[in-house]
Amino acid sequence: MTEFFKNINKIQFEGTDAINPLAFRHYDAERMILGKSMKEHLRFAACYWHNFCWPGSDVFGAATFDRPWLQSGNAMEMAHMKADAAFDFFSKLGVPYYCFHDTDIAPEGTSLKEYVNNFAQMVDVLEQKQDETGLKLLWGTANAFSNPRYMSGAGTNPDPKVFAYAATQIFNAMGATQRLGGENYVLWGGREGYETLLNTDLRQEREQLGRLMQMVVEHKHKIGFKGTILIEPKPQEPTKHQYDYDTATVYGFLKQFGLENEIKVNIEANHATLAGHSFQHEIATATSLGLFGSIDANRGDPQLGWDTDQFPNSVEENTLVMYEILKAGGFTTGGFNFDSHVRRPSIDAEDLFYGHIGGMDTMALALERAANMIENDVLSKNIAQRYAGWNEDLGKKILSGDHSLETLAKFALDSNIAPVKESGRQEHLENIVNGFIYK
């Protein structure tokens, strides 16, 4: 293993009185809640890209991180060093899972054949690392957005040769994900959108993207991949408008191409807020549509209009997130992947741990609070009472199709219907939720 984290020991749970900044105060992996351990409920993962590929640069300035695996040198040697550092970090942090893009773990090289060869070599390395550490792969994916060839999209590119190049990456990344025991495969369409309608054929691009998704599903079944295929919605950035805008938009897209029973969503908190939604809204929408798959845990800055990918730190926000997840039965193949990165001036090795520890403690405390809400589920009782009329004779006949518009109008007139207003009691329910969060 690398020496980069040599002065950091494995992170332990030390309880709420802990003064050690490199310790968990709330995340006790084996603590039982609602019949499962915290580890089983939360299924934490750390990502390769933000932690080991981003050099700390931004559009206004150069890299700030002094990472040995990001220095100039033989690209494959740097990839091996990066893998050493990554698995050392994952192991010391104590997450059970990790996630990667294909080009996170291996250099692209100068040709498609070189990419395939480099990637295959590094998959061998990751397989060995998993055997040595016991770490598992939550999901893999292909980076079909960073290389300049994808400046006008991958699946939606006007050039079918670019489409074919992206398909080759996806083919290899899916095979690697299956080989490494990955529980999901993610599709994020970072460039699947447009900058201007002046040069865009919307129908053509939707057909292309739909066909790519169909090919992915066909290949999943051909190779016998047992994991879940996930789409990660995002409204914009890097493109002006992306076709996977939000969960509801994704559902409409999947229905159009007959994929609504084949693909679920990987919801990111910051993407939800960029789309004008709350994190809770996107999860509730996904569970109501049968699309809930996995989570990219992070947060945005409400004063900024872009994807800041900060670590989650709001127990209040994430209690409601955990409540929706628990109410829906919890994760199956998904989990909480920290698609989060330290700030550009946070240059020390310890900073990577501080960010994840804070995020893991936040989600653990949110889980605890949400479990209390489930055990004393006042919200569900209020909702059931509010919609009780739909379980009575009139409501049942409307939904079953026993009433047409004409017969329902006749019934209303004959019965002299006079609905009585009832309070939504929002403020009361908000106070109840606060009682659980701040007890």
Swiss-Prot record:
- One GO term of the cellular component aspect? cytoplasm
GO BP term, pick one: D-xylose metabolic process
Q: Which amino acid positions bind Mg(2+) 1, per UniProt?
A: 232, 268, 296, 339
Q: Which PROSITE patterns match?
A: XYLOSE_ISOMERASE
Q: Which InterPro entries match?
A: Xyl_isomerase-like_sf, Xylose_isom_bac, Xylose_isomerase
**Family named by the database record:** Belongs to the xylose isomerase family.
Q: Per its record, how is this protein called by name?
A: Xylose isomerase
* Biological source species: Photobacterium profundum (strain SS9)
- The gene it comes from is xylA
